[in-house]
């Protein structure tokens, strides 16, 4: 086990310190720069694809296993200046690619809620650290459900804010038009407190919403809400216990005085293939920077040319799932398949427009189309089933790796549309609330009620 003044490394042989779930990659303590802020007295763990100037930033990959960032991500400085203490960096699927926290160079994460089952991914370590009561809250990233799915499996709250609300500067990109910093906590109160601290414009992030846009975002202020239930989410693959928890949450919502109505968002059916076309294409581009020459893992083998060294470094440094997605992305971007990418962007635009038209509030960046099915929020399950056991997951993945991709079918639509969504634990099963672009506070408001 290698030690530094600031961190303790957990090597891939399974050595752990104070962490029986392997939820951490490095264990460190960074005191806040302000001890009297709104988050004073809290501790947090951050996903290890977010840069910190203390310790390592690995993205759970061999190719970055020795990388030390010279700077903090914007969100790290915000949390520190508002009173929260950083106590560790969490395990994840390598570069955020996975739905079980199985694809990590530092070994898999187990689920504190049920250690026979997968914790979900890619922010499995972040969810496990909260479920295991190791910290007050944790920070993850959500590209296609990577905060909400593990929150559902680990029986905690997982919030993906509106795309652009929270700065991505210092986040190692997987798919930059989808990556969103998310918050995991045991209750909505701590998530809201953290969100209020991080919901700031950052001029270092070109995708961060400017102040003039933030001020124009309409807010919903009403006691009786209308909740939409898209029939496209009523899948035959939904397990009986997921259906039961969904029905229970809808029933409780009605008892609170809110209205529930069926709606239709037809483009949802095309969301999953569109997502994997776009995400892998962006990943192939983003990960092309890792060659092991300037920084990161280097095999130090004697080879005939620099190109051969780069190929060796990347082949040895990336895990199998990351290599698969790079290949898929490069194929999508090739001249023979460019039409697939263009069609995926069109589907995304259609989905954004259709989501926007369904909400009572207007979309600050789009001209809404008219719809007769106006609602304030949407409710749906986070996953089609409860967390599978490790044996079930490994067996299904060995038969067909696409099985793990299907886990994102209920979370991907909100990611493509860039809208806020939260997974709420209802009888041990995650139920998802989604709102209009920018209407994050309303999503958190109803999540706190149910």
From Swiss-Prot:
It catalyses: L-glutamyl-tRNA(Gln) + L-glutamine + ATP + H2O = L-glutaminyl-tRNA(Gln) + L-glutamate + ADP + phosphate + H(+). InterPro entries: Amidase, Amidase_CS, Amidase_dom, AS_sf, GatA. GO terms for molecular function: ATP binding; glutaminyl-tRNA synthase (glutamine-hydrolyzing) activity. One of its GO terms (biological process) is glutaminyl-tRNAGln biosynthesis via transamidation. It is found in: Mitochondrion. HAMAP family: GatA. Allows the formation of correctly charged Gln-tRNA(Gln) through the transamidation of misacylated Glu-tRNA(Gln) in the mitochondria. The reaction takes place in the presence of glutamine and ATP through an activated gamma-phospho-Glu-tRNA(Gln). This is Glutamyl-tRNA(Gln) amidotransferase subunit A, mitochondrial. It comes from Candida albicans (strain SC5314 / ATCC MYA-2876) (Yeast). The gene is HER2.
């Amino acid at each position: 086990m290698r030690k530094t003044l600031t961190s303790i490394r957990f090597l891939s042989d399974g050595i752990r310190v104070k962490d029986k779930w392997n939820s951490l990659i490095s264990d460190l303590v960074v005191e806040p720069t302000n001890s009297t802020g709104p988050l004073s007295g809290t501790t947090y763990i951050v996903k290890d694809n977010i840069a910190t100037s203390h310790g390592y930033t690995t993205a759970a990959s061999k190719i970055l296993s020795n990388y030390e960032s010279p700077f903090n991500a914007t969100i790290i400085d915000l949390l520190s200046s508002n009173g929260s203490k950083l106590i560790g960096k969490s395990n994840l699927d390598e570069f955020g690619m996975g739905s079980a926290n199985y694809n990590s160079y530092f070994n898999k994460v187990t689920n504190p809620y049920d250690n026979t089952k997968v914790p979900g991914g890619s922010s499995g370590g972040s969810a496990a650290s909260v479920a295991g009561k190791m910290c007050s809250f944790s920070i993850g990233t959500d590209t296609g459900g990577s905060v909400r799915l593990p929150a559902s499996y680990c029986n905690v709250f997982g919030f993906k804010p509106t795309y652009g609300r929270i700065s991505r500067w210092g986040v190692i990109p997987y798919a930059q038009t989808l990556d969103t910093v998310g918050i995991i906590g045991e209750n909505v109160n701590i998530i809201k407190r953290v969100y209020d601290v991080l919901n700031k414009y950052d001029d270092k992030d070109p995708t961060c919403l400017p102040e003039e846009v933030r001020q124009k975002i309409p807010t919903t202020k009403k006691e009786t809400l209308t909740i939409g239930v898209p029939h496209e989410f009523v899948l035959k693959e939904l397990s009986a216990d997921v259906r039961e928890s969904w029905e229970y949450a809808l029933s409780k919502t009605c008892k609170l005085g809110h209205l529930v109505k069926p709606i239709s968002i037809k483009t949802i059916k095309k969301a999953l293939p569109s997502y994997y076309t776009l995400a892998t294409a962006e990943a192939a581009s983003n990960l092309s920077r890792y060659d092991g020459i300037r920084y990161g893992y280097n095999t130090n083998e004697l080879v005939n040319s620099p190109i051969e060294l780069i190929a060796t470094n990347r082949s040895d440094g990336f895990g199998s799932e990351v290599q698969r997605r790079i290949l898929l992305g490069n194929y999508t971007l090739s001249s023979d398949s460019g039409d697939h990418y263009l069609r995926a962007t069109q589907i995304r635009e259609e989905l954004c427009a259709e989501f926007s038209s369904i909400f009572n509030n207007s979309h600050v960046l789009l001209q809404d189309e008219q719809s007769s099915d106006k609602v304030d929020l949407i409710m749906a399950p986070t996953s089609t089933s409860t967390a599978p056991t490790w044996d079930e997951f490994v067996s299904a993945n060995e038969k067909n790796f696409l099985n793990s991709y299907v886990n994102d079918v209920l979370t991907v639509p909100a990611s493509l549309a860039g809208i806020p969504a939260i997974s709420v634990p209802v009888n041990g099963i995650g139920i998802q609330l989604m709102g209009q672009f920018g209407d994050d506070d309303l999503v958190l408001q109803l999540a706190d009620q149910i």
